[in-house]
């Protein structure tokens, strides 16, 4: 579960490496896979598309907390990770690193198509 002031990894090549969650757009106190959050970049790579300290929207693609599926299986990852998106929901980067959990159907199909592995 992700809440305010959570430090997250970035799973794309937009130029950011670490971001800080500064707001949740689902109206709850915590967010999980597939939710959109507001983040501020904290650690960046040189010559990236993003700047340090700027505010972006991001979709959560991996969480450490175990998530139970309808068939009873459980999925959990070793890190909390997001993909930075623009206002239309398209990713800022052109690649997504690592496996991601299946996102809500139709909302982030571009993010899922860029991923190497979708669980």
UniProtKB/Swiss-Prot annotation:
Task: Indicate whether Zinc-finger appears among the record's keywords.
Answer: no
Share an example GO biological-process annotation for this protein. Answer: translation
Q: Quote the Pfam families the UniProt record gives.
A: Ribosomal_L14
Q: Name one GO cellular component term.
A: cytosolic large ribosomal subunit
GO MF term list: large ribosomal subunit rRNA binding; structural constituent of ribosome
Task: State whether keyword Cell cycle applies.
Answer: no
Q: Which UniProt keywords apply?
A: Ribonucleoprotein, Ribosomal protein, RNA-binding, rRNA-binding
Tell me which CDD domains the record gives.
Answer: Ribosomal_uL14
Q: Which PROSITE patterns match?
A: RIBOSOMAL_L14
Quaternary structure, per UniProt, is: Part of the 50S ribosomal subunit. Forms a cluster with proteins L3 and L19. In the 70S ribosome, L14 and L19 interact and together make contacts with the 16S rRNA in bridges B5 and B8.
**Cited function:** Binds to 23S rRNA. Forms part of two intersubunit bridges in the 70S ribosome.
Family to which this protein belongs: Belongs to the universal ribosomal protein uL14 family.
Q: What is this protein called?
A: Large ribosomal subunit protein uL14
Origin organism is Ehrlichia chaffeensis (strain ATCC CRL-10679 / Arkansas)
